[in-house]
Amino acid sequence: MASSGAGDPLDSKRGEAPFAQRIDPTREKLTPEQLHSMRQAELAQWQKVLPRRRTRNIVTGLGIGALVLAIYGYTFYSISQERFLDELEDEAKAARARALARASGS
């Protein structure tokens, strides 16, 4: 078999496509065509990932909002319970005072 060249889309030995070569644009001078190609690839990747990221952000925001509302609601509930318990305690004190008054008055 002939060895795979630069234009060969598949590696004939392993049947795999070649990976893109990683470059550092700050060290290597790139042509405008290469820069344009890089921007197009980045834009395509960003547009491909954007809907999934947006969905995750919405779900995360709704989850955090639900947690905040739950804490807020529980705070109101616990404060109303404390007020209710304070009223019961006041009634119990009044009942004890009446009982003491009856006991001392008899």
Swiss-Prot record:
Compartments (UniProt record): Mitochondrion inner membrane
Transmembrane intervals: 58-78
Pfam families hit by this protein: Coa3_cc (PF09813)
Biological process annotations from GO: mitochondrial cytochrome c oxidase assembly; positive regulation of mitochondrial translation
Mitochondrial intermembrane side: 79-106
N-acetylalanine, modified sites: 2
A single Gene Ontology CC term: mitochondrion
This protein's UniProt keywords: Acetylation, Coiled coil, Membrane, Mitochondrion, Mitochondrion inner membrane, Primary mitochondrial disease, Transmembrane, Transmembrane helix
Parts of the chain on the Mitochondrial matrix side: 2-57
Coiled-coil residue spans: 78-104
Disease: Mitochondrial complex IV deficiency, nuclear type 14: An autosomal recessive mitochondrial disorder with onset in early childhood. MC4DN14 is characterized by developmental delay, cognitive impairment, motor delay, abnormal gait, sensorimotor demyelinating polyneuropathy, exercise intolerance, obesity, and short stature. Serum lactate levels are marginally increased. Patient tissues show decreased levels and activity of mitochondrial respiratory complex IV.
Family: Belongs to the COA3 family.
UniProt name for this protein: Cytochrome c oxidase assembly factor 3 homolog, mitochondrial
Organism name: Homo sapiens (Human)
Organism ancestry: Eukaryota, Metazoa, Chordata, Craniata, Vertebrata
Gene that this sequence comes from: COA3
